């Protein structure tokens, strides 16, 4: 801590600095809570400003006012002069405007009152400030923390340019800030105290508009502007009040004689009037089709109104919600009670805000049993997607008004609701009634307190289409997943299966257990997790899901919207959903109303569905066909739904298509799934307790893996195929599961390292195609190794053969994706330097000469027994080694600098030790060691050369690595251009790229700006040529 009299400060607590001084924040040595600002002025600067400093000290001692910064002490040390002044904890007005942008008229009036009070003191003592600007107007909060505007104290500071200027006196010194200088000051004319009034006018204008009234690029341009324009008229916004506009026009007069004087300024009506009277908020008089963007700016006081405080708004809401209306109100009229209530509770800060009547609120609702008398048409209800249905309050008489962008969807919704209401009765024959319930559930699906009460069963309506009015996507009906009534049975492998679910028809309404069809093929059963809303069995449920699941519907009349009585329930698919577009792949496999409990035997799984897109068609085309083994139910001949797999045999295609209709319903937008190239079988383990984070694939295999209970027909075992979808790392074994209903949920966010079995994909997705491990797929024992015939083909390309195992693996996310920018920039720089040094090392190897070429040259020279030829050959070799040594030394220097940079960045925490960083640092270290080794070897070989060839010392000193690299790059480009001219275009692109990389690295190590500019121009020309080559190649 630095000591200044009774005060102390730390040089780290820098507040700001000016042209002559530096300001620190300090405190009293005994009273540590007394904060001060210590202004340090170096005596070296006092030669020209000593007089100004004396004036500032004298003026500050004389001025004692709450709106002027106080001077506590003056201390003179051998090298500096310290002024201990009052500390303002709110910063300056410039910072305040930077944060707020503009200020309201009420705030401007509060600030201007205090500025005027300070100017009154200055004017009474004949002092002109001459440097009034936002940076010299400080803000201080009384409670040492930011509060409302009324708690801000304005203080004028920095009287370094102030001087005594009594009446009838003029000054001619040019000082201050140009944008806030009066025109007479910047034009070097005589001026008086009215110059401060101009500065105050510019400050007020900036508070109102956000920028000074007159600006220019330089003081000279501003001076020329003032000289050319005899009359100046600032652009004042239209919504400005008349008093403030008059004040600004009076202060911003170019001619000081026409400018407002101090007495008129102190007694101006804008300062004398109170705050703008706030009007009570009024309800909206009518519905508006659109809101104008300038509606707020058209009101003079709308711009300056602040939002109501939270306690006031809570008080308004409590009183408005305490007395609900008895009858349906007319929204175009306002009752006297509501107007009086709002006027009582309206705050002065709620000007130009509109309070919507409480009967529109969606937070409170009451359920109304809809009978024959109170039933309305279904198009009067606004349907919202959610866990529960919106409840119609008894006072919502008006029809909902759709959003303009959703008119088509809304019309489609009305038609669907109308057709639904008139489509007939439910299973029991009770008429359908239109009850739509407002959502009372939390985002996780739990009921909120005060939830809607149950509706009688005879009035409950079954709405079979999932509707959404808040999305711009096309409407797509999607029924809920049908499940099987609660039963306990044994699967084909002997594993017990427990179920706690209700069977629902395609419209989502509960179906009595006695009338629920038992449509299963393999005896497997779908499960449903119990939800808290199951206690209301007669309530309609609307769920908003990312992708609509496939609904295995039941055959029979009354269970679907299709006009054909024998067709199963409708299957909705959204045409805008694309394969892979969902943010989570697990959303395709699992759709549950509540989060799935790990290890629970009642986890809900919706059948897997691939949307109808081009990508999905390609995926379905990869799935082969198998013949199903039928298993009749005990109570009828209708086939059971197969939750495990759908096996289609080529010779029995027609029979399989007929059976598939019982499993997959007709899609509204895509047609029959049986018309596709194949079916997607699904296998699921209902009793699995594996963790959700386990990286295991989803194996889809025929039932033969369970011991032949559902074995395929004869002759099909050898040709059976399966599809394996994997994300992340593969398992250790490629063996099929031991149970037909085993379904292992994959982790879709796995980006970790692979296990000992190796990763199928490192950085990009690819497809693994191979043959099954044995003639009977799934017959290999657990722990068996993967099939040796697996092979990889590029992801997205058609595999050469559909024989065997097909694996789709998504690309893993690189670690650097989630890193900070400093990490990625440093890593990019390290990679560039690594590639650059590798290119330099290639050039260095070329400089040394090829050993084969040297051998051929020796054999050639052996014919000519000439001593001169031997000397020239030896000299060229030694000279090449000199160039090699220089290049190796430069490469070692660059590699060492890169390694030091990486070490420093890792220590500072800016560079994370990721896999990519470790790899590049390892490569840099290896190259560095290699360069050091080569430097040692070349130095030993060149010792004799350096000792014998002293006359070449000057030439050797002129050899620089930068020059060698530049010449090599130029030669490389020239040779590539020459080859291009002769149509020898084999590797010219590679050479161009290498030359551009050399120049890029060279621009990073050069120091001379001219050299850097030349290298940059050369590199740009190479890049243009590369671009032209790529364009011509693409055209061909």
UniProtKB/Swiss-Prot annotation:
It is an enzyme of class 2 (transferase). Residues 812-1036 are annotated as: CTD-like region. It holds the Pfam family ATG1-like_MIT1. SUPFAM superfamilies: Protein kinase-like (PK-like). The keyword Kinase applies. Residues 335-348 have a biased composition (Low complexity). Its EC number is 2.7.11.1. Residues 9-271 form the Protein kinase domain. Residues 418-428, 504-521, 659-679 have a biased composition (Polar residues). One of its GO terms (biological process) is somatic sensory system development. Belongs to the protein kinase superfamily. Ser/Thr protein kinase family. APG1/unc-51/ULK1 subfamily. The modification Phosphoserine is found at residues 430, 771, 780. Keywords: ATP-binding, Autophagy, Cytoplasmic vesicle, Kinase, Membrane, Neurogenesis, Nucleotide-binding, Phosphoprotein, Serine/threonine-protein kinase, Transferase. The active site is at residue 131. Serine/threonine-protein kinase involved in autophagy in response to starvation. Acts upstream of phosphatidylinositol 3-kinase PIK3C3 to regulate the formation of autophagophores, the precursors of autophagosomes. Part of regulatory feedback loops in autophagy: acts both as a downstream effector and a negative regulator of mammalian target of rapamycin complex 1 (mTORC1) via interaction with RPTOR. Activated via phosphorylation by AMPK, also acts as a negative regulator of AMPK through phosphorylation of the AMPK subunits PRKAA1, PRKAB2 and PRKAG1. One of its GO terms (molecular function) is protein serine/threonine kinase activity. It is found in: Cytoplasmic vesicle membrane. Transmembrane segments: none annotated. SMART domains: S_TKc. ATP binds at residues 15-23, 39. One of its GO terms (cellular component) is phagophore assembly site membrane. Changing residue 662 to V: In a metastatic melanoma sample; somatic mutation. It catalyses: L-seryl-[protein] + ATP = O-phospho-L-seryl-[protein] + ADP + H(+); L-threonyl-[protein] + ATP = O-phospho-L-threonyl-[protein] + ADP + H(+). InterPro entries: Atg1-like, ATG1-like_MIT2, Atg1-like_tMIT, Kinase-like_dom_sf, Prot_kinase_dom, Protein_kinase_ATP_BS, Ser/Thr_kin_STPK_Ulk-1/2, Ser/Thr_kinase_AS. This is Serine/threonine-protein kinase ULK2. Autophosphorylated. In response to nutrient limitation, probably phosphorylated and activated by AMPK, leading to activate autophagy.
